[in-house]
């Protein structure tokens, strides 16, 4: 393209745009924003701490900094952290801690524990969250197609994480729904598989349809 926009760049996975933005922002700003978004922090879910995601460009050369801007270099992300981040984008920047256990009941059916989401801290400015929501919605509308998620209004992005050593890349898809009667966040990673859309996409499609049926009582 002779020119591009953030919307088109995200939709078409135009890596060079995000690499250039990372180099323009510089190490300090990139690190600061990554930490605000939860990189380097652990999230405790039902008493179980997650392994912290990592963004470290302290020793990065200029080209390495650009590489980090597209999720490569030494970047590491925990799928649960990414899913929490998706929930934060959907919620205007504030995350809600998910839970693994829905409920625990006695042999007589009396509940002794009921799981519930706990509001957490702000990971993004509300305007940033809204902008990302619009961009991810555009990505589904113009690239993946709404027919992929019938009955749902989805914001999503795929990813293909190269891991080197002659291994196949990790295929990713992450996102959330905009449906008030079916608020879902999802993150799929298929390790050593291939491209995100080809590998994680079909799983995300089936997962959302099944989850929506449960939430909506269908």
Model-flagged regions — what are they?
Residues 1-190:
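Beta-lactam-recognizing serine transpeptidase/beta-lactamase-like catalytic domain environment
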Residues 12, 72, 173, 199, ...:
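Residue-identity detector for glutamine
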Residues 78-84, 199-206:
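Short amphipathic alpha-helical face segments that pack within enzyme cores
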Residues 111-113, 117, 203-218:
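Short, gly/Ser/Thr-rich active-site loops of penicillin-recognizing serine hydrolases
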Residues 124, 192-200:
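Short alpha-helix boundary/capping segments
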Residues 183, 195-197, 214:
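Intrinsically disordered, low-complexity acidic/polar segments
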């Amino acid at each position: 393209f002779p020119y591009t926009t953030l919307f088109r760049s995200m939709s078409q996975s135009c890596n060079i745009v995000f690499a250039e933005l990372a180099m323009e922002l510089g190490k300090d700003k990139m690190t600061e924003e990554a930490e605000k978004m939860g990189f380097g922090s652990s999230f405790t879910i039902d008493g179980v701490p997650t392994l912290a995601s990592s963004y470290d460009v302290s020793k990065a050369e200029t080209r390495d900094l650009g590489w980090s801007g597209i999720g490569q270099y030494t970047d590491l992300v925990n799928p649960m952290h990414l899913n929490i981040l998706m929930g934060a984008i959907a919620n205007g920047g504030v995350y809600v801690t998910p839970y693994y256990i829905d409920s625990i009941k006695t042999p007589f059916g009396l509940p002794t524990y009921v799981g519930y989401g706990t509001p957490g801290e702000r990971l993004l400015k509300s305007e940033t969250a809204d902008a990302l929501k619009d961009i991810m919605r555009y990505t589904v509308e113009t690239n993946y197609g709404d027919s992929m998620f019938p009955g749902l209004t989805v914001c999503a992005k795929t990813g293909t994480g190269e891991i080197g050593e002659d291994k196949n890349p990790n295929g990713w898809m992450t996102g959330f729904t905009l449906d008030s009667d079916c608020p879902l966040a999802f993150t799929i990673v298929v390790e050593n598989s291939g491209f995100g859309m080809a590998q994680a996409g079909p799983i995300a499609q089936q997962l959302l349809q099944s989850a929506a049926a449960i939430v909506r009582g269908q």
